[in-house]
Regions:
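Juxtamembrane intracellular "pre-TM" segments in multi-pass secondary transporters
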Residues: 1-3, 186-215
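Extracytoplasmic gate region of multi-pass secondary transporters
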Residues: 27-28, 209-262, 325, 329
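Helix-breaking motifs and short loop linkers at transmembrane-helix boundaries and internal kinks
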Residues: 39, 71, 92-98, 300-301
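Conserved MFS/SLC helix-loop-helix module at the cytosolic interface between two early adjacent transmembrane helices
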Residues: 58-94
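Structural signature of the two symmetry-related core transmembrane helices
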Residues: 74-88, 280-295
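Paired small-residue
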Residues: 86, 97-105, 308-316
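Cytoplasmic helix-loop-helix junction between adjacent transmembrane helices
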Residues: 102-141
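Helix-loop-helix hairpin linking two adjacent transmembrane segments in secondary transporters
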Residues: 137-181
Length: 413
């Protein structure tokens, strides 16, 4: 297929995600020196990591409202520039309080991205490529996760942890420049465009039953993602991988699995939809695979299994964890008109990311109490099974041939 304008949009927003996630994830392999410097337990370190998400979650709904009102591209670029400020503040922090505030600012800044980039992708992408477009463009999170963990770990072996964040400050500056130059803003065009749910109000978005169900189900993959995202290097350290760079390299499999997981599940969802099979089935299938594989991760850690096996299981778990989002976001883009899509995506992400406030701390607490991360993995598996049941409650009832009714049933309320 020749290069299309929407490919440019996908590519530049992927690069934006990479910069954001490298700054977000670099703290994971650097937690050990941070814990040593400030005398933190695993639970306290987990809370420090999760401080980012308090800002991130708090900004989701305002970000959608701001983008719908003032322009998605404008809000997107403002957020990216604030990410650079947050990274700089992290690198300059000399006390634990200042470090926590810097991470909170970084979370607030990155919270402006999601609710505005998803509608831009939806507006730029052909309808028959919607799940693939949402998946491919979302792969930047995985690539940024992998690079953040690997680069953070590698730099952490040769630089003080603060200087790592100073180096990473350049990424969002480049990203903001490229997006500002080459990505157009669909906000005004969206306000005039007819479509399903054209008369939907912001209040109707907040009353939307299936958005809340999808958000509650989405808490399960977010929980698993941030168990591995926070404690991935420590999982490998528990079974004997002591070198920071090596454990970070293995933990980066969480991000490496994102492009194939998102592309595979997005392609499957688009093809099944063309045959009349709804997207929620692919969402549930991905969650089930995630639940089974993260349980196997816990068992491998508990039994002190071989490193290669844990690496494979982390990759498989991550493949299914990321795979949830391509069909889920495509379904969202079909259910809501562009005019309120920012607030819809923001509300969905706010609900899902409540799990990120708890997963790092709870998993760290389980480690402190039991001496192992295995229990935290088992808890993630249980939540994954619950998520499957919740996802299947999205209307209409699952049956062959019903998929084409999904957007009409929900979007016109």
């Amino acid at each position: 297929m020749p290069w299309q304008p929407y490919h440019t949009v996908w590519t530049l927003l992927v690069f934006g995600w990479i910069g954001n996630y490298m700054i977000r994830m670099a703290l994971s392999p650097l937690l050990d020196p941070v814990m040593t410097e400030f005398g933190l337990s695993h639970a306290q370190a987990g809370f420090l990591f999760s401080v980012f998400f308090y800002g991130y979650v708090a900004m989701q709904i305002p970000a959608g409202l701001l983008g719908d009102r003032f322009g998605r591209k404008r809000v997107l670029i403002a957020g990216i520039l604030l990410v650079a400020v947050g990274a700089l503040a992290t690198g300059l922090a000399r006390t634990l309080v200042v470090l926590g505030l810097a991470r909170l600012l970084t979370g607030l800044a990155q919270g402006l991205y999601f609710a505005n980039d998803r509608p831009i992708i939806a507006a730029a992408t052909p309808r028959d490529r919607l799940a693939v477009g949402q998946g491919v463009s979302f792969s930047g999170l995985g690539l940024g996760t992998a690079l953040g963990v690997v680069v953070g770990g590698a730099l952490g072996e040769v630089l003080p942890w603060r200087e790592v964040f100073l180096v990473l400050t350049a990424l969002p500056l480049v990203s903001a420049t490229l997006i500002g130059r080459f990505v157009s803003d669909p906000t005004r065009r969206a306000a005039r465009a007819p479509g399903p749910g054209e008369g939907m109000t912001v209040a109707a978005v907040f009353r939307h039953r299936d958005l809340w169900i999808l958000g509650l189900a989405g808490m399960a993959p977010i929980w698993t993602q941030w168990v591995i995202g926070t404690w991935g290097p420590a999982l490998f350290a528990e079974i004997g991988v002591r070198e920071l760079g090596r454990s970070a390299l293995f933990a980066s499999l969480l991000g490496i699995a994102a492009p194939p997981g998102l592309f595979a599940m997005g392609t499957l969802s688009d093809r099944l939809l063309a045959q009349g099979i709804g997207r929620k089935g692919v969402v549930a299938l991905s969650m089930l695979g995630m639940a089974l594989s993260v349980a196997a991760v816990g068992l491998t850690v508990q039994q002190r299994g071989p490193v290669w096996l844990l690496a494979v299981l982390v990759f498989v778990t991550s493949f299914f964890t990321w795979g949830v989002w391509a069909p889920a976001y495509a379904l969202m883009a079909e259910l809501f008109p562009q005019r309120v899509m920012g607030i819809a995506f923001g509300l969905l992400n706010a609900v899902c990311f409540v799990a990120s406030l708890l997963a790092p701390y709870v998993t760290g607490s389980i480690k402190d109490r039991t001496g192992s991360f295995a229990g935290g993995c088992y808890l993630a598996a249980v939540l994954g099974v619950v998520g499957v049941s919740v996802a299947m409650a999205v209307r209409p009832a699952f049956r062959l041939g019903s998929a084409r009714a999904e957007p009409e049933v929900v979007a016109t309320r």
